[in-house]
Amino acid sequence: MLCASFLGLGLSVAIVGPTFQDLATNVNRNISSLSFIFVGRALGYLSGSVIGGFLVDVMNYFLLLGISMSATTVGLYLVPFCKTAILLTVMMSIFGVSIGILDTGGNVLILAIWGDKGAPHMQALHFSFALGAFLAPLLAKLALGPTASAENHTESDFHPALNQSSDADSEALFGVPNDKNLLWAYAVIGTYMFLVSVIFFCLFLKNSSKQEKARASAETFRRAKYHNALLCLLFLFFFFYVGAEVTYGSYVFSFATTHAGMKESEAAGLNSIFWGTFAACRGLAIFFATCLQPGTMIVLSNIGSLTSSLFLVLFDKNPICLWIATSVYGASMATTFPSGVSWIEQYTTIHGKSAAFFVIGASLGEMAIPAVIGILQGKYPDLPVVLYTSLGASIATGILFPVLYKLATSPLDRQRKEDRKSEDQKALLSSSGLNEYEEENEEEDAEKWNEMDFEMIETNDTMRHSIIETSRSSLTEPTAEVYNQYPSNALVFESSPFNTGSAHVKHLPETRTKGTNV
């Protein structure tokens, strides 16, 4: 279900690009005057990441994801009905909040369920997002069609922005769009998101107790000594990585046409091969993650991105090198983000606020770096600024990850030593417990033997007293025969084995009857 939700997330995010011209026509604006809707969505995404980071620690995961997807559904249904640019920007901001919560909550839920063993699931989650982003233009093409889109683009380009804005002010805030195909494109994705949200609500009603178990188990996880430093460095790591990824994907077309001298069809193919290898390697990473550690995958990704970006800079006008290096660069960038999230979970626990922190870093990189590169590219059109950015970001991530690894593993070695000490102490305690058990058994056996001895002594005392009473009664008889037999009985009594030394036997005094001679 998480993969299904991220498939819808990819569709929701990517559908805006192919339908941007039609949205501009719907609000009677041209493209240049409507580009700030992306800024509104990005700010909403940042706010949603922060809000989701707090809510995911106090709410049920399924409930939070269901609510965020329901809000996304409402936004998708209302966007085509917006008739003013301001209302469309506000709607995009709310839409960004919902997808920010969904993005943060989905990543945290993967970590909460599978922990540091969730690398394949994390790769599958982000592959679903890439698949949705790949399918969105196809869906827009099927819904809108090339003819309607072309007509809308031409119409929006020739109308002046001022006249369109005055026409927009006279219209209502909401209204049925003139192009029904635009409505269907967003309605299909919105319906899909609604169905997935219903399933999440059902999971919340059915398995609400599992949330507490997952949160209780997460609280017992480890916390690195340099937890805050790791999060800050990971913030920078994702800032450079996501910024370079979005920058190259956004500007490779213009770079290929203006700097490398490619035709538009070839430049479009170069752009497609970047995103195609990106999505394909995210799919293959699901299987690679079962046999490779996340840290290994990050190292391989850094090596691939550094090598390919270096070749891009050195051979920036060679078409063959551009094709090969671009495909390698797209493949190398595919697994870095999900591998980074899975890797950090191996060393320190990632809760909602922590996940929101490095997601914000990725979002800021997505906004800031492309904006700066756009300005620099305009000032220095003869320089391959996009390629320099890719190389610089690869160097930055290549330096940051060893530092991250050093900070993460040093406390872990100490922790392992402490764990070994605790295990030894447990072993000693268990062995001492065994000794105590043996001593208790010995004491019980000794008590049993003592009880048997006491029983024997009591038996001996009883028999001794009975013999004494018998002998006394026999001595009182005034017959010579009994007296003559008594010494032998006395001797038998004195040599009897029942005389155990613990009780002193007194010799009987000799009594003689009158008128008898010995």
Curated annotation (Swiss-Prot):
Segments for region (Disordered): 414-448
Keyword Transmembrane helix (UniProt): yes
Function: May function as a sodium-dependent glucose transporter. Potential channels for urea in the inner medulla of kidney.
Keywords: Cell membrane, Ion transport, Membrane, Sodium, Sodium transport, Sugar transport, Symport, Transmembrane, Transmembrane helix, Transport
Gene Ontology biological process terms from the UniProt entry: sodium ion transport
Location within or outside the cell: Apical cell membrane
Name of this protein: Sodium-dependent glucose transporter 1
Natural source organism: Homo sapiens
Ranges of Basic and acidic residues composition bias in the record: 414-426
One cellular component term from this protein's GO annotations in UniProt: apical plasma membrane
A Gene Ontology molecular function term of the record: symporter activity
Protein family according to the UniProt entry: Belongs to the major facilitator superfamily.
Pfam family, one: MFS_1
Listed transmembrane segments: 19-39, 53-73, 82-102, 107-127, 139-159, 221-241, 307-327, 347-367, 376-396, 400-420, 438-458, 466-486
Gene this chain is encoded by: MFSD4B
Positions with biased composition (Acidic residues): 436-448
Membrane topology: Multi-pass membrane protein
